[in-house]
Each structure stands twice: as C-alpha cells, then as structure tokens.
C-alpha cells in the first residue's frame, strides 16, 4: 500500500509519521510526498492542514490541482484534514469575510466555514466521539479550524462537536476539521487506511 501526502506546507510530516505508525500495526506500506501530478501513483491521498488558499494556489501553479481532482473523482480514497477539508468541499465561506474565492478541488457535497472558531489564538483541544467509525471518545487539536456547516447527497456527518459537524464522509472521501496527526492517536488514520484497503 502506498499513501501520498500533499507536501507543500502544513503538517504533512506528522501525517506521514501517523501513517507509518499504522503500518507498523497492520503491515508494510510506504508514504511518499506528493508535489506534482507524477507523484499521484498511490493508493490513497492525504491533504493536510495548513493554509487552504496557499495549498490551492501552489497546487494550481505546479499542475497538481486538476489531476488530483480527476484521481479523486475516479475513486481514489482521500483524507482531508482542516485545510484539506476546505479544499475538498464544494462550498466555502469565511467566518469573517463571507464567500471565499480560492482554488478548490470541490468534490465533496459539503459546505465549510473557514476560521469558524476564530483565528490562531482561538485554537483548542476537544473530545470527539468516534462512535460512527467504531471508535471511542478521543481528544483532538483544532487550529484555526473550519466547521462543516452542512452535507448533502451521499455525504454524511460522522462526528460533531456541540452540534457542529467536525468529521464527514462521502464514499471514499473523508474529512476532519481537526488535526488527527497532532493529537497523539492514530484512530483516524487507521480508519482511512481501512478505506484504502477495501
């Protein structure tokens, strides 16, 4: 199994370490950085947190955005965390400025509000119930986190925090508004790798 992590900025190294920890449990696998379309020969893709506008602009400039969208549309499993969730959603607004124009992959039937909880100083940790993916309650890190304000079509909420969607899935697309790679647990990565294995 080969997992690619989009590696422009953000917590891509932490995602790679989390995936390697899961590989240590379930068997062999490889994690590679994805920066260009030629790097997309993988079984699953992770789009990490960071700054969604920057990630989108760099991916567009380096010719990754359209091939990535095509690969996801063809069914490759993808995990988007925080900024990655923003990139994958069809609708994006900003908590302060409203409608946001930025390069998106836009493949998931979801609407996301950027900076829902405020800016950097409003970052926090919270306990999220992972019952929908057969997990328990775990603490996760939220950094300038977005909120998934609604899902439709085949998309469904997997976890909420104070009635706000923080994790959702549509077929092979999984998104979280929190940072599982910074939270000391591999439960989200384990679930994602089970999706890839199917």
UniProtKB/Swiss-Prot annotation:
Which positions are catalytic residues?
82, 179, 181
> One GO BP annotation here?
pyridoxine metabolic process
Source organism, top-level taxon: Archaea
Q: What is its EC number?
A: 4.3.3.6, 3.5.1.2
Q: Does the keyword Signal apply?
A: no
Asked if the Swiss-Prot or TrEMBL record annotates the protein with the keyword Nucleus, the reply is no
- InterPro entries hit by this protein: Class_I_gatase-like, PdxT/SNO, PdxT/SNO_CS
GO MF terms here are: glutaminase activity; pyridoxal 5'-phosphate synthase (glutamine hydrolysing) activity
Keywords, A to Z, come to:
Glutamine amidotransferase, Hydrolase, Lyase, Pyridoxal phosphate
Q: State any GO CC term.
A: glutaminase complex
Provide the catalytic activity annotation. aldehydo-D-ribose 5-phosphate + D-glyceraldehyde 3-phosphate + L-glutamine = pyridoxal 5'-phosphate + L-glutamate + phosphate + 3 H2O + H(+); L-glutamine + H2O = L-glutamate + NH4(+)
Which pathway does this polypeptide act in? Cofactor biosynthesis; pyridoxal 5'-phosphate biosynthesis
Q: Name one Pfam family in it.
A: SNO
Positions bound to L-glutamine: 50-52, 114, 143-144
Record note on quaternary structure: In the presence of PdxS, forms a dodecamer of heterodimers. Only shows activity in the heterodimer.
Similarity-based family: Belongs to the glutaminase PdxT/SNO family.
NCBIfam families, per database record: PLP_synth_Pdx2
Please give the function described in this protein's UniProt entry.
Catalyzes the hydrolysis of glutamine to glutamate and ammonia as part of the biosynthesis of pyridoxal 5'-phosphate. The resulting ammonia molecule is channeled to the active site of PdxS.
This chain's protein is named: Pyridoxal 5'-phosphate synthase subunit PdxT
